[in-house]
């Protein structure tokens, strides 16, 4: 039986295992034939969407991994706009609205409100939080 999943990632890109575990879980879901329609990054998890994250050359690049996963499997990557702005992860639209000189939301990520998460949860069979 194929299920539709939504993941909520609260853990930062580095510093805890939460985001990396979410990524590995996503790979396992897809390998088992399940559908993963959206990954919503909330609280500290919004840091997964920063284009300014530069891991050491011998470390796993989780931001790039999320981007590749999204491209390969057509998965939406959404960061909570309010949580992201508080933590300095800013998309083009928000940079313009707030008269900031730059944006740093990584390619493939979009910013959304909690309504985006609620919408995804309505159509999901399972919601898993990391």
Curated annotation (Swiss-Prot):
Source organism per UniProt: Photobacterium profundum (strain SS9)
Family, similarity comment: Belongs to the DsrE/TusD family.
A GO term from the CC aspect: sulfurtransferase complex
Keywords, comma-separated and alphabetical: Cytoplasm, Transferase
Subcellular localization, as worded in the UniProt entry: Cytoplasm
Entry-linked Gene3D superfamilies: DsrEFH-like
Annotated EC: 2.8.1.-
GO BP: any one term: tRNA wobble position uridine thiolation
Active site: 80 (cysteine persulfide intermediate)
Alphabetized SUPFAM superfamilies for the sequence: DsrEFH-like
Pfam families: DsrE
Encoding gene, per UniProt annotation: tusD
Molecular functions per Gene Ontology: sulfur carrier activity; sulfurtransferase activity
Primary localisation category: cytoplasm
Protein name per UniProt: Sulfurtransferase TusD homolog
Role this protein plays: Could be part of a sulfur-relay system.
Domain of life: Bacteria
């Amino acid at each position: 039986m194929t299920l539709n999943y939504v993941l909520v990632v609260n853990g930062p890109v580095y510093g805890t295992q939460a985001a990396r575990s979410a990524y590995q879980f996503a790979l396992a879901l897809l390998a088992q034939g399940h559908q993963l329609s959206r990954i919503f990054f909330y609280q500290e998890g919004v840091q997964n969407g920063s284009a300014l994250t530069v891991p050491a050359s011998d470390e796993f690049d989780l931001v790039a991994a999320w981007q590749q996963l999204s491209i390969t499997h057509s998965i939406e990557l959404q960061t909570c706009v309010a949580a992201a702005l508080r933590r300095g992860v800013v998309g083009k639209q928000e940079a313009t609205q707030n008269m900031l000189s730059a944006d740093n939301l990584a390619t493939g990520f979009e910013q959304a409100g909690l309504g985006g998460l609620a919408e995804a949860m309505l159509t999901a069979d399972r919601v898993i939080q990391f």
